[in-house]
Structure formats: structure tokens, C-alpha cells
Amino acid sequence: MKLKEVNLVQKGAFQESFLEADKQSLLLYYQNKGYIDAAVTDVVRETTYNAQKMRDELTITYVIKEGAQYLFDGMTIEGNVIFPTEQLQSLIKLKKGAIFNQTRFQESLAAIADLYYENGYTSNGFYPETNKNTETRLVSCVLHISEKPRSHIERILVTGNTKTKDYVILREIPLEPGDIFSKKKVETGLRSLYNLGFFSAVIPNIQNGSEENLVNLVVDVEERSTTAIEFGVTFSGVTDPSAWPVSLFANWKDSNFLGTGKTIGVNVTGSNDEQVLSFNFSDPWFLNKPLNFSAGFNIKHKALTALYYNYVPGGVNKSNYYMNYDQLSFGLEAALGKRWVWNFAAFTLTGGVANDFARNFYDNKLYVPVDTTVSDKYGKFGVQNSIWVKGALNARDVLFDPSKGWFASQQFKWTGLLPKLESEYFLRSDTKGEIYFTLLDKPMSETWNLKFVLAAYTGFSFLFPAQGSPIGKLNKLYIDGMFNGRGWASAGDQSSSLVGHAMWSSFAELRMPIAPGVFSLDFFTDVIAVKETPKKMFTELSGNDFFFSFGPGLRFSLPQFPLRLMWAWSFKMRDGAFEWNTSTKNTGKFVLSFNLTNQ
């Protein structure tokens, strides 16, 4: 019902146009219960004055004549040659002998028409002949089908775009002039266009062509900004009172550079312990093929700590004393991938290479690092090369703010390509999976739905070192507190010094879009565990290894502003006993993160 009683969230204002719509909703409700002769015979309006609230209040009474309840007596199909009767009958959602349901009856007719439509038969005629037997109270139908030849695409036109080039839009639609029309291919193209993030609306329109059995596909788009300029300040707790607890960042990114669909971005980050300058570029249609090429360059300076050998009476202590050192690094990376787009999902196979050159600075007269990967880069630039390959299946309805669907990926990365010139040789495996369900989608007004989406993720990461090769601390797996184990990783908490070769990270989120496609309120819960080796992840994992967190958050789903603002309470179980995060106790912690999309 569009007319709502006044309450905390409804104004209760009367609109005459809604009255007729509500009458039709009432009739449909009865028709779905088998009362096909139901009628609204009168609408009685009574106005009273509420002296306490000083307003007129209207009471509306619908007078309904229900009539008799009917059962469905089946559907006979005539005129079909292209598809067998058994196949068409299987699309009928009403079973013979069931209570007649008008909505399911119409859905059955639409499903039969869609089968033809999806296979290019857009000019067919469908003429249902409904028969009502008032004595037996049965409803039957004879569907007459007038089959015509397949329709072909004459032209594909684009309207509404002012920045984006026509070819950027047309290449996402898997149809060309002369092709047989396919509804599924049109839907696949629309999904691809939405996932570009360039448009707030994509509306298809099928028009008759210049001749019979020719159609024109018109795609009308509404562009949105693809350029993002961000400046930010984040605050974090530090244990050093002389440290500057502020991190500054600035980003510039255009994901549709000059309307060509290419992405160019620059990022600058500055904090007390890290400064980064990075550039990146990507082209999703490299060489005008469905190939994604990306490249990046970065310069970093980090202030780090590492264990060092401390000679004490009676031996050497190598587990309690930390040294400070600085690292200057340069990084280059490039990747090339190919994608295959199907009706149910898109598959991407990508390979890449990365080169990092790093040099460490510290007083070698005072310190000898325990980690040999630190000392190997002292006084000279050490090199670290890696190659990787990744396969990903994406069946999410919308890439940046999904309501349904799933995603799965597997990546293998080998680090260490030059014998004797590099200090680390290991394989890293990353397995990821996501799934989304819409739990509720109820219209509350003409422009807003109350919607809840359940999102779930799990991921496994493993490191396998080559025989005799160490893995430095910077490459080991850990809880970062921003993307996994949100709310943890504060200085001095139970997770801050935990690193390993195996990590299992999962989360579940209940999302309520406030402005769909812009931002939503979320409630999240994270679970994460880190173990020394992959084998121990499967043989020695216990409840003591898990770190938990939960809390509310505000998530921005615009590609140009992918921020997440969260308040996280974190805890763990130790020998079955509840234990708060030792750094935040039960007060919680503010977490600034980014809404990154797995691809």
C-alpha cells in the first residue's frame, strides 16, 4: 500500500494518486489468492479532527466484494514450432489444481516470451485466451503463439554521454550490427557498463529497425564524475611520545581519463614512519582487445624496527632488543590480463611482474640484525623480483556495491628470480571468496527502499619458503587492523607482534544502503588467525589463535571516494575465557579503511 498511516518514519500525507494504486494492489492481492472476480465497490472516507494534535485525520475504508475462489486448470500452448511444448510447459509456475495466482500466471507468460526473446525472436505475438468456468470454479488458458523469424541488430546507438567516448561504451556490449538479438547479451553488456563505475544509470531501449525483423539497440547513459581528488588526515595511537601521531594523504585519480576508459592516478602519503609517492596507470582494453594492462611506480621511505643481537653476560640475546633503521625503496610493477565475459560470470586470467630495489640505513657498528634480509640490504640497494598469476571469477551484480552474487580468486606469486642476487625465495598463495545475499528489499517511499544485504568473505594466505631461504619480517603475514582483523594491530595489543606463514581471515557484514551506490550503514564482525606455518594452520589451530572484532561502520561505495569509517571492539578467547583487546579494552577504536574491491 502506498498510502501509509502516520508514524515515526511516515508523514501519513494523503495523495489522491496513491488511492487508485492502492485499489489495484488490493485487487492483485485477492487475485493472487484465487479471487479473480474481486472488486472494490466503494471507498469510504471519514474525516475527524484531532484536537490534541490540532489536525484533520482521514480514515479510509475499502469496501470489497470478494467473489468465489478459483483453481488453475492448466495451460494449453498452440502455434509453437521453434521450441517444444514440453520446454514451454516447464516455464509455467502455476501447477494444475493449485489456487489461481494472477502474478504467477503473468510471470509464466513472461517467461515463455523471454525464452523467445533471449534467442532473438523479438517480433513474435503471444495471445493468451483465458477461460473461466463459474460452475467448476476453474480457470484455464490457451496460449496462441505467432512465431516470426529471428530479429537482427541493425544499429547500436549511444545517447547521454558527454565525456565518455562512444567506443568505450560499445565495446562493453557483446553485440554488433548484424548479430542475432540476444536479451542475455544485452543484460551482460549492461552489467559490464555499470561495473565500469562511469555511469549512475544505464537504460536500454529496443526500437524497430528500418525493416521487419530488424531492431535498433539504444543505450542511454547518465554519466557521473570519475575524477577523485582526496586530501585526508588520520590519527593513530603511538607509544613514542615524541612521534607525530598524524598521517597525511593526497590522491588524484581519474578512472575515465579523457573519456577513454583508461585510469591514471597519483598518491602521496606522509606520516611519522612512512612516506610514499606512487603513480599508476591501467588500460582495460589494451590494443583494443579485452586485455587489461596496468603499470605502476613508487618511491618509499620507511622507519622500521628489527631484532638485533645483544651480547650480554652469559650469551647472546636475540629476541628482546630492537634496533631502529630506515629503508629507501623504489618499485616497478606491470601486469597483463585477459577476460572472458559470459552470461553468468566473468573470468579473468592475469599475470604480472614486480621489481623492488631497497636500501637499509643504520649504524652497523652498533647493531647486527637478526633478520639477514635487513643486513643484506645495508649500504647497497638489494633487489627483489617477483612474478605472479591470478585467476578470478566474478558473478556479482554490481562491482562496487553488490546486492547479490559471488566472487572467487586464486593467486600464486613467486618471489626471488635472480640466484645469489636476492635474499628471499618463496611462494605465496592467496585464495579468496565472497558471497552476497539480499535479505530484505522493501519500498518505504517512492524513492527509497529499506534494504539489508548480507556480505561474507573468507581468505587463506600461505607462504612456502624455498629450502634454506629465510622470509623477512616485511614479507610475512600479519594482522594489519585496517583490512583484516579490523580494530587490532594497535601498539602493545595481543596481535601487534604476531607474524607467520599462514593466515585465515574472514568477515561477515550486514549492510543497509542509505543512498544506494553512494554510502551505507554497516555492521561487521571479523575473525582472523595467523600461524607459523601452513601445516600448523591445519593441524594445530585452536580457539586461542583467533582474533575477533565487531562494530558499526559507514561505507562509501563511490569508486571516487572509497572510504570506510568504523568503530571496532576487539577481543579474543584464551582457554575459553573472554579477553578484551589489551590496548583498547572495552572502549573500542576508530578505524579508517578503504572500500577496496577484489577483482
Where is each model-derived feature located?
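Outer-membrane beta-barrel and related beta-rich outer-membrane complex signature
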Residues: 305-309, 357-367, 422, 445, ...
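Periplasmic polypeptide-binding modules associated with outer-membrane biogenesis and secretion
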Residues: 1-239, 247, 251, 265-285, ...
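Flexible, surface-exposed loop regions and adjacent strand-edge segments
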Residues: 78, 160-162, 310-316, 365-373, ...
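Transmembrane beta-barrel strand/turn architecture of Gram-negative outer membrane proteins
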Residues: 264-266, 328-337, 353, 406-416, ...
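Hydrophobic, well-ordered secondary-structure elements that form the walls
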Residues: 193, 252, 281, 391, ...
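Outer-membrane beta-barrel transmembrane domain signature
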Residues: 527-549
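Extracytoplasmic gating/loop element in the C-terminal half of outer-membrane beta-barrel translocons
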Residues: 211, 215, 442-528, 532-534
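Gram-negative/organellar outer-membrane beta-barrel architecture
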Residues: 12, 179-400, 406-407, 452, ...
